[in-house]
Curated annotation (Swiss-Prot):
It comes from Thermococcus kodakarensis (strain ATCC BAA-918 / JCM 12380 / KOD1). It comes from the Archaea. One of its GO terms (molecular function) is lyase activity. Coiled coil: none annotated. The keyword Zinc does not apply. Its EC number is 4.2.1.182. Component of a hydro-lyase that catalyzes the dehydration of mevalonate 5-phosphate (MVA5P) to form trans-anhydromevalonate 5-phosphate (tAHMP). Involved in the archaeal mevalonate (MVA) pathway, which provides fundamental precursors for isoprenoid biosynthesis, such as isopentenyl diphosphate (IPP) and dimethylallyl diphosphate (DMAPP). This is Phosphomevalonate dehydratase large subunit.
Amino acid sequence: MYLTKEEELILAGEYGYALQKAMEILVALGDIYGADRLIPIKSAQVAGVSYKNIGDAGIEFLRDFVEAGAKVSVYTTLNPAGIGDDEFMEKQMEVLELYRKMGIEVTSTCTPYYGANLPKFGDHIAWSESSAVSFANSILGARTNREGGPSSLAAAIVGKTPNYGLHLDENRKATVIVDVKAKVKTFADYSVLGYHVGKTLGNDVPYFKNLKPEKTEFLKELGAAMGATGSIALYHVEGETPEYREAITDKLETITVEDSDLKAVRESFQDDWSDIDMILIGCPHASLPEVKEIAELLRMRGKPLKIPLFITASRAVKALADALGYTEIIERYNGKIIPDSCFVVSPIKGWYRGIATNSGKSAFYFRSFGFSVRLDDVENLIKEAP
């Protein structure tokens, strides 16, 4: 991989240990993936935030960078943090403080685009959360690979990333056409579709036909579910996403999605309400319109839920919900908005037995953790819940 004179000096340690170590990570990645050079990035989004995921070894890794004086050189935000007991939270707060000392904005969310970290079409970025990567690539038309925590941090420190993968035009072309014959209209429909397609395709770049999403949130959930059951980091939707016109250049294989395919997924996540003791919405983190809808549905229900309803959202969305009165309504009916956190990366085994959710991503992970899972649209969950 070609390096400029300045980049060579960084790699040689002339600009300090922190930049040298970050550059070593980027050069290793570039060599592995055959990148021709490093390219500047506009922003970064760093995973490896929950203490559940990184442990003490991760804290030592971050501490080494901080003690070497590492500072990020582009606007950088974090993935959600975990929540747990007092001992866990002490470690979790240490992780956040280490990131803060590197100049990272400690807003811990998988939807940074609902706040200040909103890239423009064509921007090169280095993001690591799978659903955020999918949203940035597919809906915003920005360009990022699905980075790991260390590589996104290294890119944030250096301000550059290796030029390979989805940064290149040729790798953003569709590799398979997905002809959707099934009826797909609601949030949960898109969630189930994403679950099925991710599991079926793995790491392709799908081009969807016959989808007419009413809300951007539907596409957010489609990408999140595909990123959970597969490794899909970019997709195109005919007539909807910004790069669909240039996405097909060759004759491609077509797969068809029928109602029966989605029915099979739904039926696999229909555990009885007697096994469910929590409703979880906000995977990826909920938007303000999603929070508003939940407040309205709870008000229509007219009586408090007997099991808790947790909504995970970014700090920015929570602040708006507070100001607009949605939070007060939600709390009146046994709900709570939890900012900057994620139950998937929290040690909650033993706290609850089963979850009800509208998220295919949540359904996938919590089933793998051994929880009972019920998957449906939030309207039905709030209406049917005890």
